[in-house]
Amino acid sequence: MAETDSKAPAKAKPAALRKGALVKVNRSAYNDSLEAAASDPTAPDYIFEGPGELLLVKGDYGQVRWNRPVPDVWLRMDQLESCG
């Protein structure tokens, strides 16, 4: 069999966030999401300013703990960005 060079060009992918990473929420990705619709009409500023610690990653979602006396939250990974 002859080998063919039909490889698709690799897309540049941002660095994946891992457990323990310091993150904040991307405001534009969050505002029109299902998570925003299910929450208070105005999200607290601290989630957009960060940092929050990424505790766990399961599939497309990450669990974030803020350095405040508030519950941990699950958000889609595409709504999170690195704080560093």
Curated annotation (Swiss-Prot):
Q: Which InterPro entries match?
A: NdhO (IPR020905)
Decide whether keyword Methyltransferase is in the record.
Answer: no
Q: Which GO terms describe its cellular component?
A: plasma membrane-derived thylakoid membrane
What Gene Ontology terms describe what this protein does at the molecular function level?
oxidoreductase activity, acting on NAD(P)H, quinone or similar compound as acceptor; quinone binding
Major localization listed first in the record, in broad terms: membrane
Q: Does the keyword Cell membrane apply?
A: no
**Catalysis: reaction(s):** a plastoquinone + NADH + (n+1) H(+)(in) = a plastoquinol + NAD(+) + n H(+)(out); a plastoquinone + NADPH + (n+1) H(+)(in) = a plastoquinol + NADP(+) + n H(+)(out)
EC number(s) on file: 7.1.1.-
- Write out the entry's keywords from A to Z: Membrane, NAD, NADP, Plastoquinone, Quinone, Thylakoid, Translocase, Transport
As for subcellular location, the record says: Cellular thylakoid membrane
Give the bilayer topology.
Answer: Peripheral membrane protein
Fill in the subunit field for this protein: NDH-1 can be composed of about 15 different subunits; different subcomplexes with different compositions have been identified which probably have different functions.
Query: What protein family is recorded?
Result: Belongs to the complex I NdhO subunit family.
Identify this protein by name: NAD(P)H-quinone oxidoreductase subunit O
- What lineage does the source organism belong to? Bacteria, Bacillati, Cyanobacteriota, Cyanophyceae, Synechococcales
